[in-house]
Amino acid sequence: MLSKNFLTKTVPAAFFALSLLLVTACGQQSANTQPQSAAPQGEASAPAGGEDQAGKTYKIGVVQIVEHPALDAAREGFIAQMAKNGFEKDKNVVYDLQSAQGEMSNALSIAQKFQGDGDDLILAIATPTAQAALQTTKEIPILFTAVTDPVAANLVASMEKPGGNVTGTTDMNPVEEQLKLIQELKSDAKSVGVIYNSGEVNSKVQVDMAKEAAGKLGMTIQEAAITSATEVKQAAESMVGKVDAFYVPTDNMVVSAISAVLTVAEAQKIPVIAGEENSVKSGAIATYGIDYGKLGEQTADMALKILKGEAKPADMPVEKQAEMKLVVNKLAAEKMGVTLPQAMLDRAAEVIDK
């Protein structure tokens, strides 16, 4: 039989030892059940970018001011080029594709949605959507494309040094070379009609450029300002008998309703020269300009650098497309009563005849 002193001294000690063993065992079990993906304390996380950040899904908000072939081509070129470089749609990139339907208020609401969703990057196609995105966020990187003059639009401080969270690619078209096409088609042309959206900076810049270029070529520009696509046909009709040709710049509102201009031009046998090739494919006679699909690809190359952490918008110069090409539409020329010069056909990069 144990003495009272032995029990008094020994039992508490044994209980303490047993408790210590239980606490240690529980601690080891807890450590062994930590998620395997947890990084050791103090270890830097992997840099952003496709294969370097395993398991990350990027969110890219894409907004264009309106849907028409040129802007659509820029969007599809961007997505295709991203996929070629490992950023595949619905695999490691989720695109939120939006159209503002020509309304600035819609563009602002969409940009606010992108900010609320915490998107990794915003692609703004055309000037108004880029302005809306910049107005909404100064933190999310914004890339624009199909913007004629980003400095005049107050998107960047300069073409060489944007200085903020915005950069991208410009679609500045060679206006003087395009107006020369009118003289090549109709040597006695003196007056050129230009319809444009008075609310888009992009368009005002091109009208001023057209006036300057026309002056050099011995022609004048007749302007017709509109505020909605429904006014395009009436504007074109108001110029009948006053102009020798129409010039359709890369004005998003007018391009989206170019069929209205073409209807008047074909009925009155007035040649139409466009600011970009998709308008020629839609029925204008010719253009000398850029490829919007390739412009989208070029913009994607910039996005890749941003997402991989290799560059920041503030330090990335605005890029332009180096190569221009002549595209002509033989069927459109026939409908407008114009004979295409053989010299123009011979140097064309693309001839549309069906």
Where are these regions (language model features)?
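Beta-alpha junction/loop-to-helix N-cap segments that form part of ligand/metal-binding clefts
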Residues: 100-157, 248-266, 270, 275
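Hydrophobic alpha-helical segments within soluble ligand-binding/sensing domains
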Residues: 150-189, 291-311
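Bacterial signal peptide processing site
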Residues: 27-30
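An alpha-beta-alpha
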Residues: 60, 78, 167-215, 318-332
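Structural motif
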Residues: 94-116, 224-239
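C-terminal motif of bacterial Sec signal peptides marking the signal peptidase cleavage site
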Residues: 21-25
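Hinge/cleft segment of the Venus flytrap/periplasmic-binding protein
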Residues: 308-354
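Extracytoplasmic "Venus flytrap"
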Residues: 47, 55-85, 96-105, 199-203, ...
